[in-house]
Amino acid sequence: MTRWPSPAKLNLFLYITGRRNDGYHNLQTLFQFLDYGDTVLITPRMDGELRLVTPVEGVAQEDNLIMRAARLLMARARETGRLPEGAGADLGVEKRLPMGGGLGGGSSNAATVLVALNHLWQTGFSEDELARLGVQLGADVPVFVRGRAAFAEGVGELLTPASPAEKWYLVAHPGVSIPTPVIFGDPELTRDTPVRSMETLLKCEFHNDCEHIARKRFREVDAALSWLLEYAPSRLTGTGACVFAEFNTESEARRVLEKAPEWLKGFVARGVNHSPLQQAIAGQTESW
């Protein structure tokens, strides 16, 4: 069995700049990885089978993102004559990231499967090819495939490499799961934030346009942010439900975590501009 890191991400800022004709929203956001996340487990098989060894309660196997990613890569490799005879895999995930938390867990899992199976099966797809497969699974998957902090536009698929400060974060989960459509479907969501350049946005104070909706509709999110803001600059990540506070040192973040009320679960992690997955592929590190 091989173990592969599947890191979390934070949206350091998130602005909604318009609604598209297809119902999706245009946005501008800044992705950064954390040195914390899930672990994807892969055991190569030689009988051509793909098996899920860690089912997720409430998620049908055909809807599971790691299985969808594996089937997508297998199909593309077969179409292009790159699939080794008998290539298959047992697939699983050790979950640490909450579902519906805004940390990108499912997208990260899918990207890790694409990148790791491409490596294990030696199918030879380029980063661009894997990213094009990934966007079929979700708008956030390409940033995890590419493994570099990025400024994203469009629906999140147009990526420009970025190098935000690698700060320490206390990431807290308020104990609720927020489906993305709940936030994007709210009539009070800000949808007309002016489009600005990456250079301009990096100089401004960071905000998340989804935050006021999450706080309005989920009192747990409001309470978590109110508590964190007593100690440090804090924001919602993605559409929630997770929130985060930023610190200059690990010790500062851990001191605040020790004071957290019982109802607020969290962890401390460092923001990193290069994904632990890419380091694992390069043989520079093992999974956490």
From Swiss-Prot:
GO terms for biological process: isopentenyl diphosphate biosynthetic process, methylerythritol 4-phosphate pathway; terpenoid biosynthetic process. It comes from the Bacteria. Gene3D superfamilies: 3.30.230.10, GHMP kinase, C-terminal domain (3.30.70.890). InterPro entries: GHMP_kinase_C_dom, GHMP_kinase_C_sf, GHMP_kinase_N_dom, IspE, Ribosomal_Su5_D2-typ_SF, Ribsml_uS5_D2-typ_fold_subgr. ATP binds at P98, M99, G100, G101, G102, L103, G104, G105, G106, S107, S108. Transmembrane segments: none annotated. It catalyses: 4-CDP-2-C-methyl-D-erythritol + ATP = 4-CDP-2-C-methyl-D-erythritol 2-phosphate + ADP + H(+). Pathway: Isoprenoid biosynthesis; isopentenyl diphosphate biosynthesis via DXP pathway; isopentenyl diphosphate from 1-deoxy-D-xylulose 5-phosphate: step 3/6. The keyword Transferase applies. This is 4-diphosphocytidyl-2-C-methyl-D-erythritol kinase. It holds the Pfam family GHMP_kinases_N. It comes from Cronobacter sakazakii (strain ATCC BAA-894) (Enterobacter sakazakii). SUPFAM superfamilies: GHMP Kinase, C-terminal domain, Ribosomal protein S5 domain 2-like. The gene is ispE. Belongs to the GHMP kinase family. IspE subfamily. Homodimer. Catalyzes the phosphorylation of the position 2 hydroxy group of 4-diphosphocytidyl-2C-methyl-D-erythritol. The keyword Metal-binding does not apply. Keywords: ATP-binding, Isoprene biosynthesis, Kinase, Nucleotide-binding, Transferase. One of its GO terms (molecular function) is 4-(cytidine 5'-diphospho)-2-C-methyl-D-erythritol kinase activity. The active site is at K9, D140.
